[in-house]
């Protein structure tokens, strides 16, 4: 199985590589169109900032390519943001796979960025079938994806209920 990790100068790529290697998968990290298209699965990892990530994807002409991927594609953290339509982070137009917006947490009560454990609920995807309702997941983020028709798991923080995971056709994001 060929797994490609999209290279676009985002952080957290090495953590994804280590996780895949522990599963016995040797991923390739690339922004080469042919290698991405020939991969069996694609991961868009990320810690970073939405506008600079989108700028890189456009410069490399990967923005249109990504939305046409046919193979299973997973966006993680910033990867989730990029797969949405728009991010409040520097008022960024994103890829639009998921017709939902990414908003910044605003709170006078809770800390932002949110760093900690939350439970996820309303699991609605076969990709989550091995998880139980109220499973704890760890977050480090200042932005969240609004709930939409593509929400397959949700959580809440700072009085906001939001998408913990999204799923549309071959695209999944968490």
Positions of the model-derived regions?
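Extreme N-terminal starter segment of soluble prokaryotic enzymes
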Residues: 1-4
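Short hydrophobic segments within beta-strands
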Residues: 6-8
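Cysteine-nucleophile active-site neighborhood
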Residues: 48-114
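Short acidic low-complexity segments
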Residues: 27-38
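Structural motif
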Residues: 43-45, 173
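Conserved Rossmann-like nucleotide-cofactor binding loop
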Residues: 11
């Amino acid at each position: 199985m060929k797994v490609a990790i999209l290279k676009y100068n985002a952080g957290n790529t090495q953590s994804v590589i280590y996780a895949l290697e522990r599963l016995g998968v040797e991923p390739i990290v690339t922004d080469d169109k042919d290698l991405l298209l020939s991969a069996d699965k694609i991961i868009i990892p990320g810690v970073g900032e939405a506008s600079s990530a989108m700028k890189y994807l456009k410069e490399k002409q990967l923005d249109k390519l990504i939305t046409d991927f046919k193979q299973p594609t997973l966006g993680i953290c910033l990867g989730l943001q990029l797969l949405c339509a728009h991010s409040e982070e520097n008022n960024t137009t994103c890829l639009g796979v998921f017709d939902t917006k990414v908003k910044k947490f605003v709170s006078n009560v809770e800390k932002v960025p949110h760093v900690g454990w939350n439970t996820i609920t309303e699991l609605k995807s076969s990709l989550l079938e091995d998880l139980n309702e109220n499973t704890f997941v760890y977050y480090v983020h200042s932005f969240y994806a609004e709930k939409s028709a593509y929400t397959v798991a949700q959580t809440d923080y700072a009085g906001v209920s939001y998408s913990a995971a999204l799923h549309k056709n071959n695209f999944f994001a968490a």
